[in-house]
A protein has these predicted regions:
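N-terminal accessory beta-strand-rich subdomains and adjacent acidic, glycine-rich linkers
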Residues: 26-207
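Glycan-recognition surfaces
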Residues: 316-361, 395-500, 517-532
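Extended substrate-binding grooves/exosites of carbohydrate-active enzymes
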Residues: 502-515
């Protein structure tokens, strides 16, 4: 049996610290284009030394009073190569911690490559953000190291890659509050096997109720509808939907002979003003009958379930002051940075989400796709208890959808607060949106989806996004990845355009998906490579049951020099069942 050990971080806390410059409170109010790189912080003299031994979740103690943010230099072990997980970054755009669906795997041999303008990166995305949430290293001794940022009760850590390739760990309240004297720093694990190293790190995280509210994927129920084929309005209509379009498409779906069992109504139905939600009823001009007519098309053996899209904070920019909520709900809201938000205490936040979920359930919906989750923290930033309140939003949504037996798809939920608080839900998007006819983006999508599943797949089934079966460029590519993902599979073609050859291999006669025992992940030789530029085949695998596995060898290279690659498969034992 292989032995695995936790990396320990021995942090000797002194009463001496270095403040690089005198500064007042930092304004952490979030704005598009605002970066928190090299943010004002109290520089701690003690290095986080990854060569020493301690617990998988070390704490920093004796933090001086009236400190918003600390910065801790990190001493890395010798490494051969690795992956830094962060969003992409472009001037004037959203930045960390609004990771949306854009937590991307940036592969390197030396961390300073990520700060080089010549870094080849990932096609269809901008340059790597040097502020990120996780780090995976292959060490010179042949072992693997996994480190991940975590949240405390009102603190959040993140990793910053500096121009010289060094790493600094920051911990902050991201608001007007000061850090407690003791805060968790990060999650860390070292081991001989890359899969077990990551899995054991998450097992340690699940035991720490201050840093997370998590259960493993295998310990949670999987919502019944997601075991079947679905259809979503988004990629076909985007937000240009209305009552007649949805009803006509449901009729066409039923007549198509394809057993689609649920419909997901995406963005475009909400009542809002300036992208702030005004009520949990649909736009009256687009949906004059509310949801009653659409719900009448549910049938036990046809379209059995209907789901609805909303944002965690209401709509893209939160809740409107000009709303139609009952007075008791209004009392659970407060103004901050131009929006109304649930809060300020946990009881009020929970009462808002109780109303949120119950209102939509009463209207006939079976599950929710809750989007824009990573932007909830930015909406609270710059205020008091920003992290605690944003975390309470995720906790409350989880608790209420579970209590009211509503299914939940998580989307744009790739910051630490979102990923580490899926106590009941069992599906999260692992990638940027799929785009029709865009082969390079499809390749990037697959690379991100499979690599992120190494992390997120510990606690949820990965959602690889919807796809068009009629996509003549990427349709078959997408169909295969959905099949092996184990997560929800939902089409977004105009129903008249369905291509049965890309659909029927995924399902039985009742529309039930053929699913693997665990989600597909990259095989060992493919994990720490960038398959878009490697010149090699990219291999992923998932256990299929009875000791068998499903394997796909991709050519994801985008260079014309590698239009063909060779892959050799030999019959041998590739994985133990525990590795999945």
């Amino acid at each position: 049996m292989r032995e695995y050990k936790a990396i320990f971080i021995c942090i000797l806390i002194c009463n001496v610290f270095v403040c690089p410059k005198s500064f007042g409170q930092t304004d952490y109010t979030y704005e598009k284009g605002k970066s928190f790189k090299n943010t004002n912080a109290l520089s701690m003299t003690d290095t986080i030394d990854l060569t020493s031994i301690s617990s998988p979740i070390p704490y920093k103690k004796s933090i001086p009073g009236q400190t918003q943010t600390i910065a801790c230099p990190v001493r890395l072990l010798g490494y051969v190569r690795g992956i830094f997980f962060s969003r992409d970054s472009r001037p004037g755009d959203f930045e960390w911690p609004n990771n949306t669906n854009r937590l991307l795997p940036w592969v390197f041999n030396d961390l300073k490559e990520l700060t080089d303008t010549r870094y080849p990166g990932i096609p269809s995305n901008a340059a790597p953000s040097t502020l990120g949430d996780a780090l995976l290293l292959e060490l010179t001794n042949g072992e693997y190291l996994f480190a991940k940022a975590i949240a405390g009760r009102n603190s959040l850590s993140w990793l910053q890659v500096n121009d010289n390739g060094s790493v600094t760990l920051y911990v902050s309240t991201l608001g007007k509050d000061y850090l407690k004297p003791e805060v968790p720093l990060l999650l860390i694990r070292q081991g001989k096997d890359i899969y077990s190293t990551i899995r054991q790190a998450y097992q340690a995280l699940m035991k720490n109720t201050e840093a997370a509210d998590l259960k493993s994927r295998t310990a949670k129920e999987y919502f019944e509808a997601f075991r079947y084929l679905g259809w979503c309005t988004w990629e076909h209509y985007h937000d240009d939907i209305n009552e007649s379009k949805v009803i006509n498409d449901m009729k066409t779906i039923e007549a198509s002979g394809i057993p689609i069992r649920y419909v997901l109504i995406d963005d475009g139905h909400l009542a809002h003003k300036n992208r702030q939600l005004t009520d949990f009823i649909p736009d009256k001009q687009r949906f004059p009958s509310g949801w009653k007519k659409i719900m009448s098309y549910k049938k036990e053996n046809k379209i059995k379930w209907i789901g609805l899209w909303y944002s965690l904070s209401g709509y893209w920019m939160g809740l409107s002051p000009e709303n139609g909520f009952p007075q008791v709900v209004r009392q659970a809201l407060y103004p901050h940075a131009g929006s109304l938000l649930p809060g300020t205490d946990s009881t009020r936040i929970r009462s808002f989400y109780r109303y949120y979920v119950s209102t939509l359930k009463e209207q006939g919906f079976d599950f929710l796709k809750v989007d824009n989750q990573a932007f909830t923290l930015p909406l609270y930033m710059g205020g008091h208890e920003s992290i605690r309140q944003a975390t309470d939003c995720n906790r409350s949504l989880e608790a209420e959808t579970h209590r009211q037996n509503m299914g939940l798809m998580n989307c744009m939920a790739q910051n630490v607060i979102n990923t580490d608080h899926t106590s009941y839900s069992n599906s999260t998007r692992v990638s940027i949106d799929y785009k029709k006819y865009d082969e390079d983006m499809a390749k990037s999508h697959l690379f991100q989806s499979y690599t992120n599943t190494l992390l997120l797949g510990q606690t949820v089934w990965p959602d690889h996004d919807m796809f068009h079966s009629c996509d003549t460029v990427c349709g078959t590519l997408m169909a295969r990845s959905k099949a092996i993902s184990g997560g929800p599979v939902y089409l977004s073609d105009a129903p008249r355009d369905f291509i049965k050859e890309n659909i029927f291999p995924l399902i039985d006669e009742q529309g039930k998906l053929f699913r693997p025992e665990a989600p597909a992940v990259p095989m060992p030789e493919s994990i720490l490579t960038n398959p878009l530029w490697s010149g090699k085949a990219y291999r992923v695998a998932a256990p299929s049951g009875n000791g068998a596995m499903t394997l796909i060898c991709y050519n994801l290279n985008v260079s014309p020099r590698h239009q063909q690659v060779q892959a050799i498969i030999k019959k041998r034992r590739l994985f133990s069942s525990e590795q999945f």
